[in-house]
Amino acid sequence: MCIRDRYKGIPLSVAATMEISEMYGKDIRYCSNRKEVKDHGDKGILLGSPIQDGDKVVIIEDVTTAGTSIKETLPIIKAQGDVNPIGLVVSVDRMERGQGTKSALKEIEETYGLQTTAIVTMAEVVEHLYNKEYKGRVVIDDKLKAAIDAYYDQYGAE
């Protein structure tokens, strides 16, 4: 089962479950947690397929900065029964420090025992866009690259 908090992640979860189903012939369910419980329509904090006892859950995130959404999401998952959160897939790892000097993603891995992976890191994004032209302008020029480097000198993980 895949789960993602907030509505932005629904397309990510749908795409992931469809690809897993196509590649491996697995029937994967997904759900999303809402910002707040609804008292009408499809009630509850979770939208989609219910989490059931024995489920292994992979959390899908669009971006991880400090790990706050994981701290909010894990209790919701665990409250559903005898479930096993096993992993976190992040579209973009911003590579920022968590509480200490390690990245937020590394802290999540160590704190919650989840396997974590990112599809792409900010370093890869910056490297790819540095001095690249798009519609007649350079996406990340020397000035912007210097500002990004200064930001990561201050807030980046070791």
Question: What residues fall within each predicted segment?
Answer:
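Short, small-residue-biased leader/transition segments that mark boundaries at the very start
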Residues: M1-I3
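Fold-independent oxyanion-binding glycine-rich loops
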Residues: R6, N33-E36, V92
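Gly/Ser/Thr-rich loops at beta-strand to alpha-helix junctions
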Residues: R6-L12
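Short, well-ordered, mixed-charge alpha-helical segments that flank or form enzyme active sites
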Residues: P11, K38-D42, A66-T68, E96-G98, ...
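Short, glycine/charge-rich flexible loops or terminal/linker lids adjacent to PRPP-binding catalytic cores
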Residues: V14-V57, T68-E72
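Non-catalytic interaction surface on structured domains
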Residues: R34, G41-I45, D62-V63, Y151-Y155
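A contiguous pocket-lining binding segment that forms or flanks enzyme active sites
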Residues: L46-M95
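PRPP-dependent phosphoribosyltransferase catalytic core
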Residues: P75-E158
